[in-house]
Amino acid sequence: YLERSGKLDDSLKILGVARQDISTEQFQEKVVDALNMYVSSEYFDVEVCNKLIKRIDYCCCDLKNPDDYQKINSSLSSWSKPIAYYLAIPPNLFETVCDGLNSIQILTNESRIVVEKPIGYNLDSSREINDKLSKYFSESQIYRIDHYLGKETVQNLITLRFANSLFSSQWNSKSIEYIEITAAESVGIEGRWGYFDGVGQMRDMVQSHILQLLCLIAMEPPSRLNDEGIRSEKVKVLKALRPITDDDIEDSFIKAQYSDGQILDNKKPGYLNEEGANSESTTETFV
């Protein structure tokens, strides 16, 4: 979308970093395959795709190996613009990566770092991670994101609520009796078993994606439709939620795992039968 709409600067470059020992060309092929899979045919443009692919380079690197950060340094040596580091990795590696980037002296006041949820396993670990990030980045340099907010349906919620007079005047407790949010997936873990089993649906989906949806649905109209105004109203919703007690968990919560079944005429293995699964796992896939 950004490439097609001309929102990317001509000098923008993208460096993919992972342990897989493949060439830049092989990595680019993976990107093309992903675009073909996830971009609808009506929007897919070969010329736009080729332009995007030319921006992409690849670096094979073990983020746990301090010596490998010199490979990243070499790959970035010709870059002159400020760099944003997108950490799509387990949160327990955030500090390791920050230490590694700092060791090759490429972090500046213009650097930015992007971290995705879940940021930690619980409140204590989340605070610890944020403290570690602040060793190298100021608050204005840190972007904590939830990719779910980029979905078209979620984006449309704000327009539906606040730019449509038909709904904006009726979207209140007098007209709405209750709210039910269902987030149903058409796929299973799809190769993410190693990550997901240590997180579970409550941490992976409920405390991030679902709470974000709840905030957008329940918040009051912000005084300004900008980042600060929307964030402020979301916080008010979260502070107004009734804390969950042990009795609530006992009486009102159901946890489960999906079993062998069929999705869109395709047979799918149950959670405990997925590739790499631990048959003794009690991690929830349904809440």
Regions found by a protein language model. Give the residues of each.
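Secretory/organelle targeting and membrane-embedding segments
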Residues: Y1-V115, I119-V287
